[in-house]
Amino acid sequence: MQNGYSVSIQHYTAKTTAMKTLKIWRPIFQRWLGKKGPVDPRYVFSRPPNNKGQDGTHFFTNPQDDNGGDNSGAEGIGEAIAKQRRQKRTRFAYNLFWVSIAGVLGYSIGYKVIYKKEQSFLPLMPASRVHKLNDRDARRIGIDKIRVLSRLKVLEQLSQHEMIKEQYGVPLLNVNTHETPNVDELTVWCEDSDPCVTGLVLEPDDGRPTIHNWYRLPYVFKWRLTHRPINIHKTINDISQNLGLTLSDVFQIITPEKVYGSFKYEYPLTSDDHYTKIWFLGEMKLGDDSLIIYKGKFHRDVTLEQIHLLRRENGKLIRYILYKNE
């Protein structure tokens, strides 16, 4: 019995030792069988170390995203430098813009208005030469006066035209009412002779009465939006005066067109910033199918520029030029 029991124990011990040995050698055999190429004898019973270090060019990026080859690092550095330069230029332009605005406002408001107590003008954008008349200017000019004078001038010119005398007769009468035609529509506007800019007029807030509507910073300054012409000759003259020169002592520019009755000496609006030219456009009906349209300018008296007749004939609208000031 004892011999049989000893044999069983020895058999169990040998089996256990063989299983432990198999567990130790199994990963080695698997690595030998699965690895291609010769096996390094230094790492038969261990794993070879991983010598791959961190790539400095991909410290914050994934190396798999880099498909540019050896030049990818240099290209990335170049793009970063170019981006930084663009940001510096943008920042410089932005700072220069605000410094310029601060300088202009400081000179216009702080120096001219507050310190020297003078008027200052800040141009903002180009303005149209054509402007509508406000109520104050319309009352001062007298729209009714333009209506009466233009009607008399138009009737005088039409009564002398051969076509009007033959087809409508003299005195000229409305075909439907058999009365002298009246002005049905009249539009009046002003036009500047020089290019204009829209800007801000700044003045000290001294409490004086004024005809304009102002925005105020009490006891400091006031401002309003207006437009002013760009007179090159006046600008050069102002610059020369600041330098101690006077152009009128050397020469004087005389434009033959700018005489009485032309742009420069047209109807001047009192206390306004510049001279303007007053234009008007009127309509008079001669019948259901006939319409007189005339255009002219006003300076104490009416000067006609054009008179047209619009008439419907055979379903078509025909225009006749009856008068044109050459």
Swiss-Prot record:
GO cellular component term, pick one: mitochondrial membrane
Topology class, membrane: Single-pass membrane protein
Record carries keyword Transmembrane helix: yes
Main location group: mitochondrion
Compartments (UniProt record): Mitochondrion membrane
Region entry Disordered, spans: 47-75
Biased amino acid composition, Polar residues: 48-65
Segments crossing the lipid bilayer: 93-115
Keyword annotations of the record: Membrane, Mitochondrion, Transit peptide, Transmembrane, Transmembrane helix
Transit peptide: 1-40
Record flagged with keyword Chaperone: no
Domain of life: Eukaryota
Family according to the record: Belongs to the AIM39 family.
The protein, known as: Altered inheritance of mitochondria protein 39, mitochondrial
Organism: Zygosaccharomyces rouxii (strain ATCC 2623 / CBS 732 / NBRC 1130 / NCYC 568 / NRRL Y-229)
Phylogenetic classification of the source organism: Eukaryota, Fungi, Dikarya, Ascomycota, Saccharomycotina
Gene this chain is encoded by: AIM39
